[in-house]
From Swiss-Prot:
Induction statement: By abscisic acid (ABA) and dehydration.
Gene Ontology cellular-component terms listed: nucleus
Native organism: Triticum aestivum
Residue spans of biased composition, Basic and acidic residues class: 13-23, 41-85, 92-109, 120-151
Entry protein name: Late embryogenesis abundant protein, group 3
Positions of region (12 X 11 AA tandem repeats): 26-153
Biased composition (Low complexity): 200-224
Keywords: Repeat, Stress response
Disordered, as annotated region: 1-169, 193-224
Length: 224
């Protein structure tokens, strides 16, 4: 009985020992595995950290390079824009100068043309005025000469008409006077003859042509 118990204890002890050994092995293996895992994890973490650090450095370097390139491009574009602005300003300045110069030249040409045209018009006006004045003077001279000629002709005609009229008037008056005298003498003679009277009768007449007074003496014989 005791022998069985001892054997059982022995077996239990072996089993326990084997279990403990196995457990120890397992634990050791687990510990080794855990250590390996931890080391691998540490190594992986280190590698990851290094990779991350390297990646960050690369990213930072790329960002710096990109920023530098961007800054350089911006600087270059700014310089190009500045040059373009300067060129545009210079072109505008030259264009403004050319426009002003052209306007100045056109104004000078217009002034010269205006002065020339004004001079020509003034000269033409002077010539026209001189021609008009000369024509008016000549016309006035012709009119004056014609008036003088007409006045001379009129005066001559009036003078001749006056002389002719005077001659005609004198002749008519003389004839009328003679007729009247003859009529008076005839009437006187008739009366004297009728009354048987006779005598001398003197009749005074005026010559209207010469203004002289004449006497007409008629002798009448009285019949006894």
């Amino acid at each position: 009985m005791a022998s069985n118990q001892n054997q059982a204890s022995y077996h239990a002890g072996e089993t326990k020992a084997r279990n403990e050994e196995k457990t120890g092995q397992v634990m050791g293996a687990t510990k080794d595995k855990a250590g390996q895992t931890t080391e691998a994890t540490k190594q992986k973490a280190g590698e990851t950290t290094e990779a991350t650090k390297q990646k960050a450095a690369e990213t930072t370097e790329a960002a710096k390079q990109k920023a530098s390139e961007t800054a350089e491009a911006t600087k270059q574009k700014a310089a190009e824009a500045k040059d373009k602005t300067a060129q545009t300003a210079q072109a505008a300045k030259e264009k403004t100068y050319e426009t002003a110069q052209s306007a100045k030249e056109r104004a000078a040409q217009g002034k010269d043309q205006t002065a020339s045209t004004l001079g020509e018009k003034t000269e033409a006006a002077k010539q026209k005025a001189a021609e008009t004045t000369e024509a008016a003077r000549q016309k006035a001279a012709e009119a004056t000469e014609a008036a003088k000629q007409k006045a001379s002709e009129t005066a001559q005609y009036t003078k001749e008409s006056a002389v002719t009229g005077k001659d005609k008037t004198g002749s008519v008056l003389q004839q009328a006077g003679e007729t009247v005298v003859n009529a008076v003498v005839g009437a006187k003679d008739a009366v004297a003859n009728t009354l048987g009277m006779g005598g001398d009768n003197t009749i005074t007449t005026k010559d209207n042509t010469t203004g002289a007074t004449t006497k007409d003496t008629t002798t009448t014989t009285r019949n006894h």
